[in-house]
Amino acid sequence: MRVFGWIAPVQVTPVELLVKACWWLAAGMALSAAVCWLVLDLLALPQFTEHSAIIVLLVILWFITLFALTMLFDRMKTLHAIGGLVLLSVIGGLLAASLFSLQLCLVLYGVTGGMFALGALIAHLYGERLRNGRFYWLLAAAGGVLAVVINLALEGDTAQWCTSLFLVVLFSVVSARKSPEMLDSARGLYRQQFVTVQHCATRGALSIWLGAATAFLDILQTLMFLVSSGSSSASR
């Protein structure tokens, strides 16, 4: 007989984990949008649009942050994961503000954040019925519909359409790929120590953010390789 057998951590359920991870990602996107609005509209800092040195500095800071968070991820507690999400959201917002217009920044973060907010509602209402990755198809569909509605309402140009739809696909695919890893991590944490759903959700949200950033860099590197290969072939 186990005297203290009744003392056990709450089982981490997949639906709870999805809902909270989606809300954390939506909150991160909202924070990035707020940073863009603060820099480009409220403070109207000309340095973010006139000086290329700011862009270079933010890109370097972005790479350092990604590398540091990736290396430290396995040892992160709840507050560390939240801090990582806040840091990524703030630096991402500053970098977006240095590269794009305020409208484009708000559209991109609004579409992506709205997609995850809708994903949280979908998971909360129908999560138990969604099997075999159907949740992520619905997540992508919700993001796609949101992107179409917002771009039609704002009469967005081609770049705005393509970028917003690209982010929907990117974050949906990365979320689907990170889902088994996130659930396995939750099971492992449950077996080893006392944990909360919030702990697993913040780590899951951070892993999706890091995965999306890494995937974007891989795509960018591939495109640069293809362009350089094409230009070298043409020069011959």
Q: Predicted regions span which residues?
A:
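A hydrophobic alpha-helical transmembrane-helix feature that marks the membrane cores
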Residues: 1-236
